[in-house]
Amino acid sequence: MTSKILTSNVATVCGWWAGVAGALAVGAGLLESRPPLAVWALAGAAAAAGAGLAARARVLLWAACGLSLTAGCTLLMDVIALLFGQRVDSVTGAVTHALGLVGALLTGAVAMAVTGRRNAAAGAPTGPPGRWIPYLGVLTFLPYVAMKLHWALGGTFAGVSGAEVLAQSERNGASGLWLTLERWGLDATVLMALVGILLLFCLIRPWGLRLPRWLPLTPALIGTATLVPYGLLGLGYLVLAQTGAVGISSGAFRSEDDTLLVAWIGYTAFSGYGVALLAATRWYWRRTRGHGGPTPLRRP
């Protein structure tokens, strides 16, 4: 009975979300001359969610979940910018990203309930999905961390020096905190990567089960919903760019080859870590389901 009430409440909240998201998307489309692509994805997600809720159609609900992920997959970039005192590129875009992430969680939960996958009688897994998971996250991030630290320490990589990277950050309006860290030989994204690696270990190691459930799950869900689609879509685009099917701007780099090299390092890190985080989050979610506080540990 409790499960049915919870599912009904989630569906109700999802319906309200669809209304708010749809209204925002329509408003942005009417008021802005060139609304972000995420706005159109959010509009499609709201429409699919509304139709899916009315018909209890899991295909439409999963489509809404996918479109919501597309709309919200860059939310993490907005969060990082705000954490380091920077302004987001677009307020409309940031709100769209946040609504997209919330919508992905809501529509995904309702879709799972419709398909019967959320079975309260299902037993929780007895052990972590694999102790290799956090090490996968570490390995995929190592080249990225090395590249960013090399620049922060004044080195040159892909034809760009650390001084040029710092100057580019200043031109892009980086915050004082961000620039100060770079001058000290630290890169803000490297610090976030280290926090992310710690989160991976927290999700699958026994000491992580002693924490309140929401504490690791909140950043884990945000990271999973943003990094997995962002990283995988980025890799897909790079494959097309590498084969010449699409073009790629060299940007601050001296050649397209340099741009591709740096992009491969970045998107491999994001996608590899995102997949590892997805597996760890899924296990932690199932292992701690029904526990609002720390989970007691059983000795073998």
Regions from the PLM with identified roles:
Residues 53-66, 199-224:
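Loop-to-transmembrane helix junctions at the membrane interface
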Residues 1-12, 115-132, 291-300:
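Membrane-interfacial, low-structure loops and terminal tails that flank and connect transmembrane helices
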Residues 252-300:
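Extracellularly exposed regions in secreted/surface proteins, prominently low-complexity, repeat-rich
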Residues 63-71, 136-152, 218-236:
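Hydrophobic alpha-helical membrane-insertion segments
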Residues 8-11, 57-60, 89-92, 96, ...:
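Membrane-interface helix-boundary signature
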